[in-house]
Amino acid sequence: MPLPDTMFCAQQIHIPPELTDILKQFTKAAIRTQPADVLQWSAGYFSALSRGDPLPVKDRIEMPMATQKTDTGLTQGLLKVLHKQCSHKEYVDLADLEQKWKNLCLPVEKFRALLQLDPCEDKIEWIKFLALGCSMLGGSLNTAMKHLCEILTTDPEGGPARIPFGTFSYVYRYLSGLDSDIPESDTEAYLSSLKENAAARKNGMIGLSDFFVLKRKI
């Protein structure tokens, strides 16, 4: 025989007083992040919330990127979310990183394709994964570096997007090293010229205006 439905009285149902605020914050986060799969994202959100981890939430709503050549689903905003969740570690476990990727409703085949650019075993240096993600957004090496600066900077949005030159040069060498068409001598000559400007004017920092020129259509 089927078991009878369990009945609860009002005194037995405990609703924590903070639930209303939790749901308000969740709703705001969902609106900002606009997840493709709300159920998947919600599971990741509340899992992170229960552990006290950084939440998979964008800082703001993103408009679609017309310049992205392939529809990977990946955006600068989502990379920034991953950076918040992973940057406290120098190396991240691929299994944990893949789960965070899935929680943002990104296709897992794109995650694996990204790792094929620089295959590794169980872990990857976070800054390298971030660099690969920036390169996946499309465009040139300088465009990838632009995305990197805008993610890593502590400057206000729309500001110079400065980061330490040491970080910039490390990532630039890494990405250029993955491209067999870029001679190492060209990379070093380019970084040397940028370093002189950074040392002279920026206190060891480099910003977008030092290397990135937006081409305007006439």
From Swiss-Prot:
It is found in: Cell projection, Cilium, Flagellum; Cell projection, Cilium. Sumoylated, sumoylation decreases upon spermatozoa capacitation conditions. InterPro entries: ROP_DD. It comes from the Eukaryota. Its main location: other. Residues 17-46 form the RIIa domain. The keyword Transmembrane does not apply. One of its GO terms (cellular component) is motile cilium. Keywords: Cell projection, Cilium, Flagellum, Ubl conjugation. Gene3D superfamilies: cAMP-dependent protein kinase regulatory subunit, dimerization-anchoring domain. GO terms for biological process: flagellated sperm motility; regulation of protein phosphorylation; sperm capacitation. Belongs to the ropporin family. Component of the axonemal radial spoke complex 1 (RS1), at least composed of spoke head proteins RSPH1, RSPH3, RSPH9 and the cilia-specific component RSPH4A or sperm-specific component RSPH6A, spoke stalk proteins RSPH14, DNAJB13, DYDC1, ROPN1L and NME5, and the anchor protein IQUB. May interact with AKAP3. Interacts with FSCB; the interaction increases upon spermatozoa capacitation conditions. Interacts with CFAP61. Functions as part of axonemal radial spoke complexes that play an important part in the motility of sperm and cilia. Important for male fertility. With ROPN1, involved in fibrous sheath integrity and sperm motility, plays a role in PKA-dependent signaling processes required for spermatozoa capacitation. PANTHER family: ROPPORIN-1-LIKE PROTEIN. This is Ropporin-1-like protein. It comes from Bos taurus. The lineage of its organism: Eukaryota, Metazoa, Chordata, Craniata, Vertebrata. The gene is ROPN1L.
